[in-house]
A protein has these predicted regions:
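Classical eukaryotic N-terminal signal peptides for Sec-dependent ER targeting/secretion
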Residues: 1-25, 420
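N-terminal signal peptide
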Residues: 25-37
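Aspartic protease catalytic domain
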Residues: 33, 45, 66, 136-143, ...
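Aspartyl protease catalytic domain
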Residues: 34-45, 126, 131-242, 327, ...
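Signature of the N-terminal lobe/flap region of pepsin-like aspartyl proteases
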Residues: 44-141, 146-148, 276-291
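Short conserved beta-strand and strand-loop elements enriched in small hydrophobics
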Residues: 52-55, 121-130, 184, 229-232, ...
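Short hydrophobic beta-strand that contains or immediately precedes a catalytic carboxylate
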Residues: 53-55, 62-66, 73-75, 152, ...
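Active-site beta-strand/loop microenvironment that shapes enzyme catalytic pockets
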Residues: 68-72, 238-269
Length: 420
């Protein structure tokens, strides 16, 4: 009995001495749970050719904005009478166009926020050794729903109309490109540059600023799975809201469209975080089943936080300065419109337009079923996942148990022993 008494007394003495060490270990274990590793780059060998297009007779020059989430690809025309655009990118060696078939008709396209109408013509296109006939080209006039719509080039090839990506496959099978890859970046909100078959070397050589996310279905959409949204700049994963949404990327959209179920999330976790927020700061209006948030310009004079969407271990940022646009001024106040709008749907699908894509250079990689984003406007959350949170809890649990065994139990024994 004396042996056990001495043992516990020694434990009390050692426990009191080692208490700061256990606190230090507890702190270190917490820090270890927050470690982040770089996400490895999937190496993709670059192709050989870049692509620029001139279409129609007389020839019209186009910069293409690739939208493979639909069968159409938005383009901006240089000779369009309603287009204020002057760049001429026609390259005779890279692409030529033959006389179109003079088949012109009228059509209407619908999407989640309205419709676009214009004239369709069918053009034959020759790109290197590749030749395709009757490619759809829609020259769309601007309207209240699609202010940036100047033209549309279809990715659908008539011989295989069910596959919207098949032009990429046809180019690959023809030997004109070595990899089934589309790459583009925006020159501004209205235009961009397309390359087919290759990725610029400066992207493939820069592992730090290039990341990818997996395409999560087979419905001919370029989309990724977003798991969380972070509505502040603290970069604390545990403050991120779980959403598990399907992110559909569309260069034909200017804004981001989010299911209406998330409206309260943004109001409560984003707008109400501003120190000067009150009930009059922002209001919600419904236009054609789209819920829009209007805020007083004076309320937004204080710079607010960015918004981060976490996909495949990376947080992609939309900065505060890009989240609002001026809309109107009445007799008393000026208002700004929040560029994330909310629509009625039963699916958890988030549509990302140019407000997101203009932040990055984008690679559509049909070889590996990936989308890649290049730019330094993101943060690595690869190791900072729910599994790490469980490991973090495990570290703390073990530390508490050790603390209890080494200090608390001997102290209890000592107190009860003296009482006897």
């Amino acid at each position: 009995m004396k042996f056990y008494q001495n043992l516990f007394q020694n434990n009390i003495k050692y426990g009191q001495t080692l208490f700061p060490i256990y606190i230090l270990l507890l702190f270190i274990s917490t820090i270890l749970s927050l470690e982040q590793d770089n996400f490895p780059l999937i190496n993709i060998s670059p192709g050989l050719y870049a692509l620029q297009l001139s279409i129609g007779y007389p020839q019209h020059d186009f910069l293409l904005l690739v939208d493979t989430s639909s069968k159409y690809t938005w383009v901006r025309g240089t000779n369009c009478t309603f287009c204020a655009f002057t760049d001429n990118i026609y390259d005779e060696e890279a692409s030529i166009s033959v006389i179109h078939q003079d088949e012109i008709s009228y059509t209407t396209m619908s999407d989640i926020k309205g419709s676009v109408s214009g004239n369709i013509l069918y053009d034959d296109i020759k790109i290197g050794d590749f030749y395709a006939t009757k490619i759809e080209l829609l020259v769309a006039s601007e309207d209240e729903y699609q202010e940036s719509a100047d033209g549309v080039l279809s990715l659908k090839y008539p011989k295989d109309p069910n596959d919207v990506r098949n032009i990429l496959n046809k180019l690959y099978l023809s030997g004109f490109i070595k990899k089934k890859i589309l790459y583009f970046n925006f020159k501004d909100e209205m235009a961009g540059i397309l390359k087919i078959g290759s990725i610029p070397d400066y992207i493939t050589n820069d592992k730090k600023n290039y990341s990818t996310c997996h395409i999560n279905d087979n419905n001919n959409n370029w989309n990724c799975l977003i798991t969380h949204i972070l509505l502040d700049d603290n970069f604390n994963f545990y403050l991120a809201n779980v959403i598990d949404a399907n992110a559909i990327f569309s260069t034909g959209l200017e804004k981001i469209y989010v299911p209406k179920d998330n409206l309260d999330l943004f109001i409560n976790n984003y707008f109400k975080s501003f120190p000067n927020y009150d009930e009059k700061s922002c209001s919600v209006k419904v236009i054609s089943e789209i819920h829009q948030i209007y805020c007083l310009r004076n309320f937004l004079n204080i710079k607010g936080p960015s918004i981060h969407f976490i996909m495949n271990g990376y947080a992609y940022r939309i900065s505060f300065d890009d989240l609002f646009e001026d809309v109107y001024t009445d007799s008393y106040n000026s208002y700004k419109l929040f560029k994330i709008e909310f629509y009625e749907t039963e699916k958890n699908e988030w549509y990302f337009g140019t407000i997101f894509l203009k932040q990055y250079e984008v690679v559509f990689d049909a070889e590996n079923k990936l989308m890649g984003f290049y730019g330094d406007n993101k943060y690595d959350f690869t190791k900072y996942t729910n599994e790490d949170y469980e490991e973090y809890c495990w570290y703390n649990t073990v530390s508490v148990i050790l603390l209890f065994l080494v200090i608390i139990i001997p102290m209890i024994y000592e107190v009860t022993h003296k009482m006897k």
